[in-house]
UniProtKB/Swiss-Prot annotation:
Family note: Belongs to the MotA family.
Protein name per UniProt: Motility protein A
Cellular component GO terms, alphabetical: plasma membrane
Lineage, opening ranks: Bacteria, Pseudomonadati, Spirochaetota, Spirochaetia, Spirochaetales
Pfam families recorded: MotA_ExbB
Annotated TM spans: 3-23, 28-48, 148-168, 184-204
Organism field: Treponema phagedenis
Keyword tRNA processing: no
Length: 259
């Protein structure tokens, strides 16, 4: 669970709701036709721009914002270091049984190719190709959410214009002008909320998760290729430690290099 995402989501909602209550009547901020125009209209327009696999799968992707995305870079260094030590002592074939239980499919596949004697350049190409396709897939999803964030305020403004047209057509009833104006502006509020409370922050968080996953896979590629080349475990560690934050780097330097 990503605690920061929950704090941001529910905290911002609570502040907005409190502002509405303190400013008057919170019920005045709910208008079902405005929801249909802003949320439904902007979402359905995405069907025109993206295939069904994206428009129907976006909610599952957005749910990842609330899941922890710790890729355990420190543990990656420790594991690859231990494998490098073992391969130098007992040979690459000794790794075969150990890697079968790895949860990380990317690391497991790369190391299996090493054990099978595949050329280092071929292993690099395979792993970098998989990483490239993952990046492309993630960037499409982030682009989808950013596109929705662009459309939502536009549909909010569209609803407002529609409401203003209706208001102008009923100018003779001056007693309802204020209420009609308020209803017209609610759709603009919804569009702004969708973009600034939900969609833009979600795209940003998914982008950060994407960067962290790319970094972890780049570390794995470097480590797997170092094991394939028979590099000394300390050389492997020095290559991978540059990816870590200063605190973890100092701890692992003391553990792996300076002992």
């Amino acid at each position: 669970m990503d605690l920061a995402s929950f704090i941001g989501f529910f905290g911002a909602f609570a502040i907005i709701l409190m502002g509405g209550i303190l400013g008057g009547s919170a019920s005045g901020f709910f208008h079902l036709p405005s929801v249909f125009i802003t949320v439904g209209g902007s979402y359905l327009t995405l069907f025109l721009a993206y295939p069904l696999s994206y428009t129907l799968g976006i909610f599952k992707v957005c749910a990842r914002v609330f899941k922890s995305a710790d890729f355990h870079e420190k543990e990656i260094v420790q594991r690859l270091y231990a494998l490098a030590e073992k391969s130098r002592r007992t040979g690459l074939l000794a790794l075969e049984e150990e890697i079968q239980d790895f949860d990380d499919e990317f690391m497991r596949t790369g190391l299996r190719n090493v054990v099978d004697g595949i050329d280092g350049e071929a292993i690099r190409n395979l792993m970098e190709n998989e990483l490239s396709h993952m990046e492309e897939r993630h960037n499409r999803w982030i682009s989808f959410i950013n596109a929705w964030a662009t459309l939502a305020p536009g549909y909010g403004m569209l609803g407002t214009v529609m409401g203003l047209i209706g208001m102008l057509m009923a100018l003779e009833d001056k007693s309802s002008l204020g209420q009609n104006m308020a209803v017209a502006l609610v759709t603009t509020l919804y569009g702004s909320l969708m973009a600034n409370w939900l969609l833009i922050p979600m795209a940003t968080k998914l982008g950060l998760q994407h960067e962290a996953e790319v970094k972890s896979k780049e570390m794995i590629i470097e480590g797997v290729l170092a094991i394939q080349a028979g590099d000394h475990p300390r050389i492997l560690a020095q290559r991978l430690l540059v990816y870590l934050n200063p605190k973890d780097k100092r701890e692992l330097e003391a553990e792996l290099i300076k002992d």
